[in-house]
Structure formats: C-alpha cells, structure tokens
C-alpha cells in the first residue's frame, strides 16, 4: 500500500508537496516585502534550506537499492468459467462496451502462459516509422468476431485475417495521411442481424431505432476514425465501403470544426459503439496555439452516418445544433482517449 515509511511510496507522496513547500519558503520574503511587511527571512530561509537538503537526499536515495513494495493482501483464486459462459468474440476496443479489458476464458492463465508459442505471424505491409515518437506507430488492439480478426494500420488501412490460419481475407486501402501522429488504436463493430441490447435500469431511454439493412448491404460493419478527419464504415464481410453510410461510406468529421489544418485535429482512438450510435472524440494538438479546434464529442447513426447529437463543452447549450456556416466553440477540452458505454443505462 502507499503508506508507511517505505522509500518509494514515501517519495510518491512527498515529492510534489515538498517541491511546492520549497517554492513557498523562498517566495514568502519577497511577497512580504511587496506588502511592505518585514521579510522574516530568518524564519523562512532556514527551513527552506533544510527542505532543499531533504530534497537532494531523497533524489540521491533514488539511486540506492530499497526493499520492494510487497503485495500484502490475500491473493484471490482463479475463477473457472462455465462452458456456457465462455466468451466467443472480442467486439469492442476494451472487450466490453464499458472497457473491462478482461475476457471470460480460463484456458490460458498465469500458470501456463509461459508455454504459449506463436501459431502464425501476419505482416500488414504498413511499416511503423517513428524515430522521434511522433510518426507512424502500430498501437492497435484488434477485434475478433467469429473466425475473423480485424486489424487497422497506422495509415488506417483495414485488414481482415483468418483467426486460425493468419491468412488475409480482405484489405481496405485507405492510406490516410497526417504530418504527425499516424496511428490507429482500434475499430468498432456493428451487426445489424443481432438484437441491440436494451437498458435494464428503470427510466433509461432505449437506443434509437435504425433503418433496416438490406441483405445485400452492410449488415455487419467495421467503423473507423482516420487520422485525416473521417469516419469510415466498411462491410465486415468483404471490406467494401458501406454505401448507405454518410457519403458512400464516409462522414467528414472536419465539418463544423472551423479552421482545423493538419495536424491540429487527428483521430487515433477507436470510435465507441453506443447501442446504435457511433461516438467519436478526437485529439487536439497541445501547446500550438490559443485558437484551436474544439473538443466536441459527436454521435452518428451507425447505419446512415447521420449526426444524431453533439456535446460541445464550450457552448452554453452543449447540444445546440449548428446552423449553416457555424462551427463548434474553439479551444475546448477534448476526449482523445477511448470512451466507455454502459448498455444497462444507454
């Protein structure tokens, strides 16, 4: 636990407030002088010097071996998974819509994971190149549905791979471009042939209905944000653009953002499927300007791509519908990371 006199937990608790204390000690005489009051430096510099000495000693202590922080709780046993409850798919970035990240399977566990051997290796053809950390990086979490694994590459190319053999099934060449931060962290998946989970919490509003999808259309679809500001829907069966979504498979996410040149607005995290709504945030570049695109969060109909709602944190009415030519409030907080969704409340 982060308590007691163990070195590392102690450092984690005291380093920041200790730094503030040193700053306060040495600023106080100047502040008192500014107010035409006695500086009281004798009462300040001595404890300030002692605090600096303690700070130096603590820093030096980081290079001396210390006892590790041991787990002091009781280890819980592995919970067996009933056969009828074994998970079949990984359909969301974080496994469940809420992002549990844990899978309901127990065949592989901490006792036998060291025995795993690669069954196959697949090369996407999109080579990550990021010597300074701002380039193309493979940071994806694939989706697995049935016998298919769905991948996305740093330039937003999407590939379906056979889960058993590792052989490619289809590839959608998107080849999105950005001057920095080329990466695709994940995808979303929607199956129109399956019932949409309904909320169980009393008073919750059910997911909005969607148009029926023709059997020859995109009944199963992959949804992806791109680094150049698009939301794309692909047929999960063959990789073709879903013609009923947006403009022949694409929604322009730069619409309503105002002045948003590359790379001020880049989408790297997976979109979030919330019932029948695809929710997208976005990355706004840091420390570039005081006039930046807004951090609006938007929800789109998963079948048609039509904008259902927007949450604009800088607007007095955060759900206001934009008129023609208007844009969302500039330089507002953004949601860059993956988001979670609670089906029990929608």
What are these model-predicted stretches?
Residues 37-44, 55, 74-85:
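Extracellular/periplasmic ectodomains of large secreted or surface enzymes and adhesion receptors
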């Amino acid at each position: 636990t982060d308590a007691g006199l163990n070195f590392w937990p102690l450092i984690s608790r005291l380093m920041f407030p200790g730094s503030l204390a040193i700053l306060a000690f040495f600023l106080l005489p100047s502040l008192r002088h500014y107010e035409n009051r006695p500086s009281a430096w004798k009462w300040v510099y001595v404890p300030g010097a002692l605090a600096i000495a303690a700070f130096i000693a603590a820093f030096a202590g980081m290079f001396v071996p210390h006892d590790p922080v041991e787990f002091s709780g009781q280890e819980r046993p592995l919970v067996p998974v009933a056969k009828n409850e074994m998970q079949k798919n990984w359909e969301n970035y974080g496994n469940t819509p809420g992002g549990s990240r844990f899978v309901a399977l127990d065949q592989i566990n901490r006792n036998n994971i060291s025995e795993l051997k690669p069954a196959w290796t697949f090369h996407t053809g999109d080579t990550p190149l990021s010597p300074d950390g701002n380039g193309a990086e493979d940071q994806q979490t694939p989706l697995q549905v049935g016998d298919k694994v769905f991948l996305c590459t740093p330039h937003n190319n999407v590939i379906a791979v056979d889960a058993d053999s590792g052989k490619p099934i289809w590839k959608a060449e998107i080849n999105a471009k950005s001057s920095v931060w080329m990466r695709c962290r994940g995808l979303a998946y929607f199956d129109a042939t399956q019932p949409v989970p309904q909320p169980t919490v009393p008073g919750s509003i059910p997911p909005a209905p969607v148009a029926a999808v023709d059997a020859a259309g995109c009944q199963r679809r992959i949804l992806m944000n791109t680094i150049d500001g698009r939301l794309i829907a692909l047929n999960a069966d063959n990789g073709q653009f879903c013609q009923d979504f947006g403009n022949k498979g694409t929604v322009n996410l730069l619409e309503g953002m105002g002045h948003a040149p590359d790379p001020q607005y880049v989408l790297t995290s997976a979109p979030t499927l919330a019932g029948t709504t695809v929710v997208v945030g976005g990355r706004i570049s840091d420390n570039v300007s005081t006039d930046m695109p807004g951090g609006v969060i938007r929800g789109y109909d998963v079948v048609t791509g039509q904008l259902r709602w927007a949450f604009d944190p800088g607007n007095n009415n955060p759900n206001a519908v934009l008129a023609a030519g208007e844009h969302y409030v500039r330089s507002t907080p953004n949601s860059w990371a993956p988001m979670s969704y609670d089906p029990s409340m929608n």
